[in-house]
Amino acid sequence: HEPVNFFGVYRPEGETTILPSTWHETGIAFFGKVYKFDYELQLVAGLDPQNFRNTNWVGKGRQEAFEIDNFTSPAFVARLNYSGIRGLRIGGSFYYNQTAKNSSKPSRNIGHKFPVTIFTADAQYKSPKNTFIARANMVYGNLGEAASLSEINRKSPKATGYPTTDVAKNAVSYAGEAGYNIGSFFGEKAPRIYPFVRYEYYNPMEKAGYLKTPDA
């Protein structure tokens, strides 16, 4: 699935850990192009904070596709791409959602908003004939009132099936990869073979969001 967007056989681990994978929501989008900039604005169903946790940050918070979406507090999304230099694309995205009212257990979140803010930046360069390809990306996320949500999680009975772990205030992921088509040494009809290198860092608990307690 989407094999042309990365070299590995698996999707980038960092992004698929801290963000929902195959993330699509019910909503409305506006898009267009101005000069060499492509833009997109979206108003979509937001996240459910009931499933935020320490191992995946908001990665499990997506409302289920093709099921009933709670549109009480929608999310705002913006995306901008620049492609004014041949072979180069640079882009960035912004996401904001006050998630508390989307909860499957809204009574637990009275008085809270649990706002989620996500910034992403990415770039891709492809040389003529795609002989050399390089990509880089960064994701930074912030969860407001993370300490309060962590406390709510810890008080949840395990029998409910909901997370009982702390949730981070900040999560981060960044990565870069580059590959070269060695098949180009054997002519244009040779198969494309891309040995590549990739570096990736991610942390769903980059900055903890739990309440501090006095030492015992």
Regions found by a protein language model. Give the residues of each.
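Surface-exposed coil loops of outer-membrane beta-barrel proteins
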Residues: 1-79, 98-101, 107
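Extracellular/periplasmic catalytic domains that process cell-envelope and extracellular macromolecules
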Residues: 21-22, 83, 189
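Secondary-structure boundary elements
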Residues: 31-39, 47-49, 81-91, 125-132
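Outer-membrane beta-barrel pore domains
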Residues: 87-216
